[in-house]
Every structure is written in C-alpha cells, then in structure tokens.
C-alpha cells in the first residue's frame, strides 16, 4: 500500500465499468449492423444467382448472363465497401478497449513503484475524465452542419486533453442531444427516432417509454388543435396499447372533446377549484398528485371532472419523459444514471468534511496595530487550502454528512496560552521569530504573539497539554 | 496482483478478441476478406465465361463453379459471423460482467443539492484554469482568455490568475526558458533556477553540441555548484561533464521528461508565490472520493445483507483513511469520554490537570456543575468552575 491509501487496480476497473460496458455494447451493436447488412445482401444475391442460373442454362442468353454476373460483382463490391466500414468501426472500438487497458496498466505500474507524484498526475487525468463526462452530459451543444457532428465544451476539453480514447463521448452526447431537444425545444422527433431504433431493448425491459412518448406526441397535437392529426396518431400508434394502458387511453381520448373547455372556463374562484382538484386527485389517483404548473394550472379546471385531464396537459410531463428516457438510455449501455463526477464529489466531501469546515478563523482575528502583521497572518497563517472550505465546494457540501473520526488528529507539543488557545509550541515560537525578523513586531527573546488575538505572552506561560 | 486487469489484457485484448493480434485481424475482418476473395473468384469466372461462354459444356462447368463458390462463401461467412458474436458474448461475460459487481449509483445516498450545482461550474472553471490555461488557443494573453471564455465560459477573473504562469509554461515547452529563469531570479528561487540552467545544458548536449554545453555549464552553473552547500547539485552536473568528456549524448526523451519536471516545479512555485492553491479543490475532493469509494461500497454491501441503515444522519458511519496531505487541514479533537468530535456547540474544556474533555461529557461528569469529579485519566479531582474553555489552533 502506498502513501495515498488508494484502492487496488481491480477496484479502479470496477469503478470504471462504463469504460468497458459501453464498448462491449457497441461491439454487439456493430455486429448486429454487420449481420443485418450481410443478411439483406445475401437475400438479394440469392435472387440474383437464381436468375443467373437460369440465364446460364440458355446458351442464347450469353450477353445477358454476363450482364447479370456483372451486376452480382457490383453488388458484392458494394457489400464489401459497406462491410469494411463497419469493420473499421469494430477496430476503432477494439483500439479503445486496448487504450483503456493500457491506462489502467499505467496506474498499476505507478502503484507498484509507489510513485506518488506519478499517481497524483494519473489521478488528475482521472479527474479530467470525470469533468469531461459531466460537461459532455450537460453542455449545450452546437452542431457542425457540414459534418453533422455535435460538439460541446466537454468534447472540446476531451480533445485538448487528448482523452478521446478513454471516454465514449459520442454515446453521451447522443443522450444529451435527445434530452436537450425534449427539455429546451419540446421536440419529440429525436426521441421517437431513438425509440424506434432501440425498440427491441425497450420491449425486452417492458419499458413505458414508447407509450409515454407517443402519448405526448398526441397531446401536443391536441394542444395545437390539429385534431385530424391527433386522431390519426391515436389510431395508428396509441390504439395498440389499449390493453395495457386502458385508463390513460380513455383520458387521452377524452381530452380531445374536453380540451377547449379545460382551457376556457378556468377563471372563476381559484381556491375552491383547487380544493375540488385535490378531492378529485384522491378519488382517482392515476398520476402523481403534484400541483399543475404554468399555463394549465391557471386555466384548467372548471369542474372537478375536467381537472383529471390536468396532468396530461401538464408541462412537467416533459421532465418526467426526459427522466424516463435517460434511465432507459443509460441502462442500455450500463452507464450510471447519476453523473459520476457528482458521486465522487459527494463521497469525497463526506470523507473530508470536518466540523471545523466552513467556519473561517479569519472571523475570529483581532486586528493588530500594524496592518502588515494582519495581512501576513491572514494570508500565511490562517489561510487553509482545505478543499471543503473552498468557496466553490463548500456550498455543495450543504446536505452531506461529516467524516467520521475515531482518533484525534492534532499536532506535536500542544501548549495552552493563558487565553485558552492551544498551539504547537515550536511552530508558535518560530512564527513569532519570523514576525520579528521581518520587522513587523518587536518581541523579546522569550515572548510569543498569539496570531489570533495578538496578545503577547512569555514562553514561561506555556502550559503543556495532554489531549488524548 | 490484479486478476481482472490481467485477464482483460492477456487473455482478451492480446489474443481472443482477434483472430491474429499482430495483424489486428478480427472475425469481422475475416468476413470482409472473404467478401473480397469471393469478388475475385467471381471476376475470374466472368473472364472464363467471356472466353468460353460459347461452349455449352464449359458453361455448365462455370455454372456449377459459380453455385459452389457462392455456397462456400455463404457458409464461411456465416461461420465467421457466428464466431464473431460468440467471441463478443464471451468477452462480455468473462470480462465486462465481473466489473459490474456494484453500481456506482448505489453509493450515491447523500445527494448534492441540485440548486447549488452552479457552484460546481465555478469549481470546474478553476480546475481548468489552474491546469490547462496553457493549452488555450491563441498567441496573446487576450486571445487565450477569450478562448477560455468562449469554449468553457471561464470568466476572465478566474483565468487571469493563471495567465502569466500559462504563458511561461508555453514558452518553456517551446524551448525558451529565459522568461522562467528571469522569474526565478526575481523570486529568489535558487533550486528551480539551477534546474532550468541544467535543463538548458542537457538540451545542448542532446543536440550534440558538447562544446556549447561545456561553455554553458561554465558560465551558468559553475558558480552555483561551487558553493559548498550545493553538493547535491554538483552530482548531476559532474555526470553531464563526464558525458561531454567521453563523447556521450543524452536522448531527447530524457530532456523532455526533465522539462516536464521543471514545468511541474515551476507551476508549484508560481502558485505558492501568488498564494494560489497548489491543487484545484475539485481535484482534491475527487481524489478523496476515489480513496473513500472502497469503504462506501463495502459498507453498502454489508448494509444490503444485514439491513442496517445509514445510521447517523449527519456523520458517516465509518472512517475513511485519507493520506496525511488530505487530512491535516483542521485540528480534530475527539472527546475521549464521548468519542465524539468537538464542535462549536460542544467545545473542548481543559481540566486543572490539563487533560481535555468536551463540554457535554463535563456536564455529565459534574452533574451539570453540581458536584466534584475525578478526571477520567488521572487521580486529580476537579469542579466545573476550575475548567477552562480551550480551542485548538493549527499553525502551518
């Protein structure tokens, strides 16, 4: 074990399961594409060969058979090109896996050599990866329309740091893009497309996502009064779900008739409406009983029967749809739902946080007549580099528990001054010497100055303490 | 020894994921080759057909050959495809599944308040500014600051602290140490000053200019080395001189490595001189998180089996052993009676015998100040009046 008490290599691998989960899934998906492509071409070739076969039987159709054979060669040629593209994909993924293994082998070497400097540097790149992951997941994206490649600050960071092989940013940004479209632009298209491409996985899991997304599409059509399209949507997409979600579908159908009344007759006395609303909720607990938001809450509900349509029109549905999507997306690739960076920060803060954190000593300082002394003490003595006390980190530590300590961790030679402050006696003496040397104070040989309240004591006043 | 990494590396990455590791040939690669071979075969048969198409017998042979090679091709494609997917499945089962022993999400019990996340953004800004300002695109400071702002939204005020450092590092990496040497002189940093000159001498020798190197040592390093207190520095210089004498050189990679050491030393010194934190707070927190993770997952595993719950609400139920440089920021006093950390509400008190207890335990021992009590550590008797509130102060 080295001086950092860092976990072993295998533990690090487990912490970074997503670095291997994603490529493993990608390999399988790439294989699926490869296989599908081959199968479809194989069927086509089967047909072509059959025609060629009959053509060859007829000696008069010499030219035609040569032509057919040419066609076949062309088909095979195209197949080869398309397959080798997928094969290149495969090699890229495999290379990533190899680079990642190399990354952890590096760590293994540093750990084996107990090389703390190198280990710290390695952990810095590890931190950078977590930051990159966070930025890619949440950054706002810009799309390069020429190459159709989305980018954001996270990807920029990955590229400047040369971390491309250690993080599957393409996957993360796909989730980010779909989710941003949902939340920011209320655009369902990318989500529906994704659902279609991954329907096998979703049905296997028995996910509600597809139904909820289609339902939302229908609701939006109703909202913009395109009833024809809404009915078409209901018939083609939603009707299959009649057995699984009968209640929701009844509501959805009802909304078509009552949507206008939901919006128009809302204004008379709000309070009683709200009471009715709650009453209705308890009678029919089909959705989460949260207050209706924004537009809908003010004007929906004239009578209690209508208010049950409220949740369908609620804009919070977008939020929950987004959450549902992210859950499905991340579970598909076995990526953690919460941002890894936040998880590490939460654990890190809790491991570090002492009861003293956030209580700055500078507030207790009593100023000295010489401002230089104050300045020196402020920046050199009481200033702590404690990461939890850092002004950006401390607010994050708000709800997090403190570290648990079983032993006191103090300092050598504790002595108490008459004012009750306990210091390391040697450090206190050397501090006073330094202040004298710099000409800030004129202390006598056996005198020290308490840096907090600036009172001066003789070293003979020191009381040796026995804290346990 | 790490078993997972070894399996991943030896058994899979270096063999089983490939048909031939040295050529980086995979099963799918084999498929592509088979398609190619098939195409060539078809072309050959086409040539035959063109040449001998008129003879019915030959036509028959060609027909059969075509059918046969199509059939063979199809079956070998299927075979390769099957072994490809089964390799992946085995890989996933043997290598990837064991990594999923626990879920990262499962230890995320104490959540960070989402309303405070904009503070995290600033922490990220500071992190990037501290370590990577020198990678910002641009030739002038202004361009670099603009780049950092437009790419990461890092405000000028944060990046400003590091821009001088970044410029010096940039110069150092481009082979010009002069600004850094001047900076060292201004700040009286003898050791780094020496290291930089030494680096210059090294690079002269690696460029195969022994005479220049010798003269450089004479003018720039000799005076420092001759000081008797700097024996430590004499050793590398004498090694360099010896290399000159025997006509040896230094590989460029060594010079680069030493340059990085110097950059690291310089940034450290720069932060010290300018009262900037040595490491970004975010980095230290994440590092503590990695170290703590092992205990959290262990606790989570035990909790699952034994149905114990996360006991104390505001304190972790276990101790995380952090390295000294991460655990010495604040003095921690654990009351020896209550075994609790002292706080503002429950501060430490000194007894007349100079043992220290927390206020709560003092109240308990003295029955709220109504009676005398014996110090739990020595025979001295005490009363509450005789105790004195103390505070522990850590000096750097």
From Swiss-Prot, chain A:
GO biological process, one term: proteasome-mediated ubiquitin-dependent protein catabolic process
Superkingdom of source: Eukaryota
Gene Ontology cellular component annotations, sorted alphabetically: cytoplasm; GID complex; nucleus
PROSITE patterns the UniProt entry points to: CTLH, ZF_RING_GID
Localization annotation: Cytoplasm; Nucleus
GO molecular function, one term: ubiquitin protein ligase activity
InterPro entries listed in its UniProt record: CTLH/CRA (IPR024964), CTLH_C (IPR006595), Fyv10_fam (IPR045098), ZF_RING_GID (IPR044063)
UniProt domain CTLH: residue ranges: 171-229
Pfam families in alphabetical order: CTLH
Family recorded in the similarity comment: Belongs to the FYV10 family.
Function: Involved in the proteasome-dependent degradation of fructose-1,6-bisphosphatase.
Family annotation (PANTHER family): E3 UBIQUITIN-PROTEIN TRANSFERASE MAEA, MACROPHAGE ERYTHROBLAST ATTACHER-RELATED
Stated name of the protein: Protein FYV10
Species in which this protein is naturally found: Kluyveromyces lactis (strain ATCC 8585 / CBS 2359 / DSM 70799 / NBRC 1267 / NRRL Y-1140 / WM37)
Organism classification: Eukaryota, Fungi, Dikarya, Ascomycota, Saccharomycotina
Encoding gene per record: FYV10
């Amino acid at each position: 074990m080295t001086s950092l008490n860092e976990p072993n290599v295998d533990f690090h691998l487990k912490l970074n399961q997503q670095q291997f989960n994603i490529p493993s899934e990608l390999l399988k998906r790439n294989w699926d594409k490869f296989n599908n492509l081959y199968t479809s071409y194989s069927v086509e070739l089967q047909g072509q060969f059959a025609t060629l076969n009959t053509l060859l039987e007829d000696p008069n159709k010499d030219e035609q058979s040569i032509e057919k054979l040419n066609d076949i060669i062309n088909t095979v040629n195209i197949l080869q090109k398309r397959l080798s593209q997928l094969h290149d994909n495969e090699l890229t993924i495999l290379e990533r896996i190899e680079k990642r293994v190399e990354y952890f082998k590096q760590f293994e070497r540093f750990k084996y050599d107990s090389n703390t400097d190198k280990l710290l540097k390695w952990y810095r790149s590890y931190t950078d990866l977590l930051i990159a992951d966070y930025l890619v997941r949440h950054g706002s994206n810009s799309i390069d329309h020429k190459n159709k490649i989305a980018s954001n600050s996270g990807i920029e960071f990955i590229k400047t740091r040369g971390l491309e092989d250690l993080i599957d940013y393409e996957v993360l940004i796909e989730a980010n893009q779909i989710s941003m479209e949902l939340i920011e632009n209320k655009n369902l298209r990318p989500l529906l497309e994704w659902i279609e491409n991954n329907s096998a996985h979703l049905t296997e899991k028995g996910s509600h996502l597809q139904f909820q997304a289609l339902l939302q599409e229908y609701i939006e059509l109703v909202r913009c009064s395109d009833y024809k399209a809404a009915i078409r949507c209901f018939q083609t997409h939603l009707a299959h779900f009649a057995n699984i979600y009968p209640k929701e579908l009844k509501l959805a159908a009802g909304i078509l008739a009552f949507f206008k009344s939901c919006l128009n007759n809302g204004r008379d006395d709000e309070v009683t409406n709200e009471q009715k609303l709650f009453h209705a909720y308890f009678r029919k607990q089909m959705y989460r009983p949260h207050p209706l938001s924004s537009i809908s809450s003010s004007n929906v509900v004239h009578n209690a029967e209508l208010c049950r349509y409220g949740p369908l029109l609620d804009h919070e549905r977008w939020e929950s749809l987004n959450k549902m999507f992210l859950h499905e997306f991340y579970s598909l690739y076995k990526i953690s739902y919460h941002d890894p960076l936040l998880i590490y920060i939460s654990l890190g803060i809790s491991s570090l946080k002492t009861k003293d954190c956030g209580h700055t000593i500078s507030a207790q300082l009593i100023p000295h007549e010489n401002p230089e002394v104050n300045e020196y003490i402020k920046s050199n003595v009481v200033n702590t580099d404690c990461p939890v006390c850092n002004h950006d980190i401390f607010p994050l530590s708000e709800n997090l528990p403190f570290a648990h300590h079983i032993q006191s961790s103090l300092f050598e030679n504790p002595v108490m001054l008459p004012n009750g402050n306990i210091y390391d006696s040697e450090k206190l003496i050397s501090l006073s010497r330094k202040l004298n040397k710099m000409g800030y104070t004129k202390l006598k040989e056996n005198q020290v100055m308490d840096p907090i309240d600036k009172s001066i004591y003789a070293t003979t006043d020191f009381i040796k303490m026995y804290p346990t | 020894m790490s078993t997972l990494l070894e399996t991943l590396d030896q058994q899979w990455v270096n063999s089983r994921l490939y048909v031939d590791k040295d050529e980086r040939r995979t099963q799918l690669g084999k498929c592509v080759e088979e398609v190619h071979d098939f195409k060539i075969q078809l072309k050959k048969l086409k040539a035959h057909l063109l040449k001998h198409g008129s003879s019915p017998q030959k036509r028959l042979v060609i027909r059969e050959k075509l059918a046969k090679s199509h059939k063979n091709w199809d079956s070998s494609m299927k075979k390769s495809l099957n072994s490809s997917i089964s390799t992946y499945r085995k890989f996933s089962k043997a290598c990837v599944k064991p990594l999923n022993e626990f879920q990262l999400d499962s230890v995320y019990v104490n959540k960070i308040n989402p309303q405070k996340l904009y503070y995290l953004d600033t922490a990220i800004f500071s992190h990037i500014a501290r370590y990577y300002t020198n990678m910002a695109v641009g030739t002038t400071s202004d361009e670099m600051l603009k780049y950092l702002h437009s790419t990461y939204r890092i405000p000028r005020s944060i990046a400003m602290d590091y821009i001088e450092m970044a410029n010096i590092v940039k110069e150092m990496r481009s082979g010009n140490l002069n600004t850094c040497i001047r900076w060292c002189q201004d700040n009286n940093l003898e050791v780094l000053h020496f290291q930089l000159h030494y680096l210059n001498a090294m690079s002269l020798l690696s460029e195969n200019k022994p005479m220049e190197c010798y003269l450089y040592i004479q003018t720039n390093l000799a005076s420092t080395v001759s000081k008797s207190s700097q024996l430590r520095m004499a050793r590398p210089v004498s090694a360099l001189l010896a290399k000159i004498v025997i006509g040896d050189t230094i590989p460029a990679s060594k010079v680069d490595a030493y340059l990085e050491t110097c950059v690291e030393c310089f940034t450290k010194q720069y932060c010290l001189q300018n009262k900037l934190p040595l490491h970004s707070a975010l980095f230290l927190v994440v590092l503590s998180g990695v170290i703590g993770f092992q205990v959290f997952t262990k606790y989570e595993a035990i909790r699952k089996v034994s149905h114990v719950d996360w006991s104390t609400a505001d304190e972790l139920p276990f101790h995380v052993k952090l390295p000294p440089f991460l655990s010495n920021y604040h003095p921690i006093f654990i009351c020896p009676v209550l075994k609790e950390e002292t706080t503002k509400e429950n501060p430490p008190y000194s007894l007349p015998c100079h043992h220290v207890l927390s206020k709560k335990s003092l109240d308990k021992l003295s029955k709220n100040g109504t009676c005398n009590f014996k110090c739990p550590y020595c025979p001295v008797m005490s009363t509450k009046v005789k105790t004195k509130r103390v505070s522990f102060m850590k000096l750097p």
